[in-house]
Amino acid sequence: MSFLTEVETPIRNEWGCRCNGSSDPLTIAANIIGILHLTLWMLDRLFFKCIYRRFKYGLKGGPSTEGVPKSMREEYRKEQQSAVDTDDGHFVSIELE
């Protein structure tokens, strides 16, 4: 049961749960939605770099590097990785000259 649907009351020197039953369809639906929401939020926080990179580039791994020299490919890869690594914070510091 969810904390939102339970009421804890002292009963005979113990903490118990006074519930009307968990067979209420609205309660079951709310619990399922809550569990799904929590699961999706946790997966998003764990894998957000991979997930959003997939949205940006689709099913391919990134922009095509066909015909580009290997040194330029490596430089581009490092640049993209550093851009992803700096995206960990919510705020970006911009200094104006």
From Swiss-Prot:
The M2 protein from most influenza A strains is inhibited by amantadine and rimantadine, resulting in viral uncoating incapacity. Emergence of amantadine-resistant variants is usually rapid. The keyword Glycoprotein applies. The chain crosses the membrane at residues 23-43. Keywords: Disulfide bond, Glycoprotein, Host cell membrane, Host membrane, Host-virus interaction, Hydrogen ion transport, Inhibition of host autophagy by virus, Ion channel, Ion transport, Lipoprotein, Membrane, Palmitate, Phosphoprotein, Signal-anchor, Transmembrane, Transmembrane helix, Transport, Viral ion channel, Virion. It is a single-pass type III membrane protein. The modification Phosphoserine is found at residues 64, 82, 93. The record marks 41 as: Seems to be involved in pH gating. Residues 44-97 are intravirion. Residues 1-22 are virion surface. Residues 59-97 are annotated as: Disordered. Glycans are attached at residue 20. A lipid is attached at residue 50 (S-palmitoyl cysteine). It is found in: Virion membrane; Host apical cell membrane. Cytoplasmic tail plays an important role in virion assembly and morphogenesis. Forms a proton-selective ion channel that is necessary for the efficient release of the viral genome during virus entry. After attaching to the cell surface, the virion enters the cell by endocytosis. Acidification of the endosome triggers M2 ion channel activity. When the channel is activated, one or more imidazole moieties of His-37 probably become bi-protonated. This is Matrix protein 2. The gene is M.
